[in-house]
Amino acid sequence: LTLYLNAQEVVTMMTIGDQPDLLALGYLVNQNMLKIGDEVTAVDYDEDLGVVVVRTGHKTNFEEKMKKKVRTSGCAQGTIFGDVIDAFETIKLPSNTKLKTSWLYELTKAINTEPSLYLKAGAIHGCVLCEGEQPLVYMEDVGRHNAVDKVAGWMFQNKIDPSNKMFYTTGRLTSEMV
């Protein structure tokens, strides 16, 4: 799937092909190319060409982001662009955050028993976004980072506040996913 932001080609991703709009939006959000509150005027997908175009109402700073690349710890030696790493130190988990191990056990059980592509075919990673013990959305893809991006795209599209949310993934977290 080749992703364009306005008229600029950004990246080509290997994916299972479902939810191309959410994958595109999430990738752009996670690369700080789209920010919460930015206006997306259209997301156009051409299945035959394997292309998704995200159109925004503002000029993007894609060229500036391309000047600064960071090689990541993922198996495929991925790359993140621009100021993504710079924001790490500003992210803090509130001291009153609670996470119950029983929630993790229930999530693992649900992921391993719910009908999914993983149960049918294997070799698929899944991510679930929860509020407390309640799952909100579950996404799968051949790449862990793609499943993460789909969840981020879903959150962006549905204007979901990340406060009080828990994120669970079936695979290890690489630096770009964090």
Walk through the language-model features, giving the residues of each:
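Feature captures the catalytic cores and cofactor-binding loops of soluble hydro-lyases/lyases
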Residues: R144-V178
